[in-house]
């Protein structure tokens, strides 16, 4: 008797399921990809029990007649390949013909579809890879696939599934990845009736889709990137270094619209950002890499999440060029978005300090003297304290002046160092004599010895609030009596989950946040100074800033969250110009605050122009 036997189709499909179907998220990915390949304009995903109990994926694509509906359950039956050469020109999401029979072999599977203009549809039901039950069904547009009781007949696999909320998180991420790859397709996902993800088709502004995935506050921080070279094109959006996460979950790379988790690509992105981010922060990018299908092999990973490039170095060089160009240009500095700089206490990138100083000086001086800053050709040479840009100097805008060259050589406490080591004399701010405002934004004062002092009140407010919140946290005492807020907000599932898991940290900071069902949270109280803040923007920013659940709650782990609080408190307080009394109160706060030359976004707080420099210009 022969010892080698041919495996049954049922067993073959279950073995294939071990590679293709890892968890509910794998099923979601495969079925949604089929919907996209069918030309769907809208895809809906409904989940129960984290996707273990039920997954329903419906689309409005081409649909299938009876013969195709039955054939798609046969292993290696596919509409994407006809001959060997097709394998090297793949432009569809699926192509192997393994996914549906593998899924049907480990679940209770139902397919309902109809060909276009058909008067009757088809329903095919399969239980655990058994024989299909084929019957007529009402006609419909597109296809609905239902997967129930995943791994019900493979208990060894089912016991390795995680808790429902963990599986749900992976399933939602599968939807998000495909939604980011196809902004022209509408995506709607729900779990037991509660919305997980909702985004209508937005082909004209993919940033709307990114904002739906990462939170509405991401939109103004996203900037286009593009690099086209022979054989490769890199397009997409990258966030300013101020909008970051504490993990790599904001890194999305797609190759020919297929989500790829490639170490080489991720490393290239991180290296491009490394001089712009504070320690422990990760960039946010959504990048599409388009190459000739013949120059990339997508058939090297069961879930197709890894690829092999014919010219990996060329792809990485194009990616580096696209990101470096955007980061050097620093478009956020002129976009109304507070710019990029490390957190307080972190070394500031010299190039970005130069950008921030140049922007501030230009606005202040043009308002005061009606003329542009001198160029590097007619400015005096930098003083001994001027920053040396060194290897980062190429990031500075051409013609940008070192701080000392712009304000003269006389020593002034805010002039030369990207990070100051010495604070001004005690009582310095309280002794300033307010003179008025410039451009509806900057406050102008007379300082000691007739020095002209120009202050950005928003940056100053943020610096003062940051000191207050940090000192309250360092004291170990409960925060001051919080203010009743009383609002409910539906947030992205990741943000809602982070806030609920971080309730202890939020309580330390003076917030009371409670789950309110689904992805809705109730914000009951906020710390003093945040009473009028935009609740949605504040909570989404806090969700990104909170430390992991395992972190010790101290001033180090909570520093980013405190920075977010200070920023939003300053936005609220500075929404309208400060009155004379409010500005004098701010000067008193600055005398009591820990001095730093910039706010946490890199905006310069205060500038001095010595009397000698004014006299020189008046000649």
UniProtKB/Swiss-Prot annotation:
Cellular component aspect of the GO annotation: mismatch repair complex
Coiled coil residues, start to end: none
Disulfide pattern: none
Gene Ontology MF: a single term: ATP-dependent DNA damage sensor activity
UniProt keyword Endoplasmic reticulum, yes or no: no
Keywords: DNA damage, DNA repair
Family the UniProt entry places it in: Belongs to the DNA mismatch repair MutL/HexB family.
Function, in words: This protein is involved in the repair of mismatches in DNA. It is required for dam-dependent methyl-directed DNA mismatch repair. May act as a 'molecular matchmaker', a protein that promotes the formation of a stable complex between two or more DNA-binding proteins in an ATP-dependent manner without itself being part of a final effector complex.
Protein name (database record): DNA mismatch repair protein MutL
Species this chain originates from: Myxococcus xanthus (strain DK1622)
């Amino acid at each position: 008797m022969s010892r080698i036997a041919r495996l049954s189709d049922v067993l073959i499909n279950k073995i294939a399921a071990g590679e293709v179907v890892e968890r509910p998220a794998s099923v979601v990915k495969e079925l949604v990809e089929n919907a996209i390949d069918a030309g769907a304009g809208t895809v809906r995903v409904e989940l129960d029990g984290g996707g273990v109990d039920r997954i329903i994926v419906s689309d409005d694509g081409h649909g299938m007649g009876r013969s195709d509906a039955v054939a798609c359950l046969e292993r290696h039956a596919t509409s994407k390949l006809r001959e060997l050469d097709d394998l090297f020109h793949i432009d569809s999401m699926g192509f192997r013909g393994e996914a549906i029979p593998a899924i049907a072999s480990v679940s209770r599977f139902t397919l309902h579809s109809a060909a276009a203009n058909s008067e009757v549809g088809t329903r095919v039901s399969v239980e655990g890879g058994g024989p299909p039950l084929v019957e007529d069904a009402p006609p419909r547009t597109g296809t609905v696939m239902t997967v129930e009781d995943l791994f019900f007949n493979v208990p060894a696999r089912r016991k390795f599934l995680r808790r429902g909320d963990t599986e749900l998180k992976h399933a939602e991420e599968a939807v998000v990845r495909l939604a980011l790859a196809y902004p022209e397709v509408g995506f709607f996902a729900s779990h037991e009736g509660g919305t997980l993800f909702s985004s209508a088709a937005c082909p004209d502004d993919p940033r709307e889709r990114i904002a739906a995935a990462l939170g509405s506050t991401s939109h103004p921080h996203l900037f286009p990137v593009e690099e086209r070279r022979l054989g490769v094109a890199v397009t997409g959006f990258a966030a300013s270094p101020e909008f970051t996460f504490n993990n790599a979950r904001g890194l999305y790379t797609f190759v020919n619209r297929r989500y790829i988790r490639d170490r080489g690509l991720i490393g290239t992105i991180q290296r491009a950002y490394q001089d712009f981010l504070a320690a422990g922060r990760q960039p946010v990018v959504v990048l599409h890499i388009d190459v000739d299908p013949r120059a990339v092999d997508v058939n090297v990973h069961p879930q197709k999440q890894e690829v092999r490039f014919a010219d990996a170095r060329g792809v990485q060089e194009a990616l580096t060029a696209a990101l470096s160009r955007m980061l050097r240009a620093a478009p956020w500095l002129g976009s109304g978005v507070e710019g990029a700089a490390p957190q307080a206490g972190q070394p500031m990138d010299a190039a970005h300090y130069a950008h921030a100083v140049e922007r501030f000086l230009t606005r202040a001086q043009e308002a005061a003297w009606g003329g542009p800053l001198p160029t590097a050709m007619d400015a005096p040479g930098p003083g001994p304290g001027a920053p040396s840009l060194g290897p980062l100097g190429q990031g500075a805008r051409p013609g940008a002046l070192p701080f000392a060259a712009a304000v003269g050589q006389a020593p002034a406490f805010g002039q030369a160092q990207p990070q100051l080591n010495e604070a001004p004399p005690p009582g310095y701010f309280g002794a300033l004599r307010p003179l008025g405002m410039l451009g509806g934004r900057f406050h102008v004062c007379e300082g000691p010895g007739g020095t002209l002092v120009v202050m950005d009140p928003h940056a100053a407010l943020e610096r003062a609030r940051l000191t207050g919140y940090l000192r309250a946290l360092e004291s170990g005492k409960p925060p001051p009596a919080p203010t009743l807020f009383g609002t409910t907000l539906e947030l992205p599932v990741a943000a809602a989950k982070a806030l609920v898991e971080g309730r202890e940290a939020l309580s330390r900071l003076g917030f009371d946040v409670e789950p309110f069902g689904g992805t809705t949270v109730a914000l009951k109280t906020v710390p003093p100074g945040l009473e009028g803040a935009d609740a949605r923007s504040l909570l989404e920013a806090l969700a990104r800033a909170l430390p992991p659940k395992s972190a010790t709650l101290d001033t180090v782990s909570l520093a980013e969250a405190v920075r977010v609080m200070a920023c939003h408190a300053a936005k609220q307080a500075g929404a309208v110009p400060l009155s004379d009394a409010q500005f004098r109160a701010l000067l008193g706060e600055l005398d009591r605050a820990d001095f730093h030359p910039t706010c946490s976004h890199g905006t310069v707080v205060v500038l001095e122009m010595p009397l000698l420099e004014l006299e020189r210009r008046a000649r």
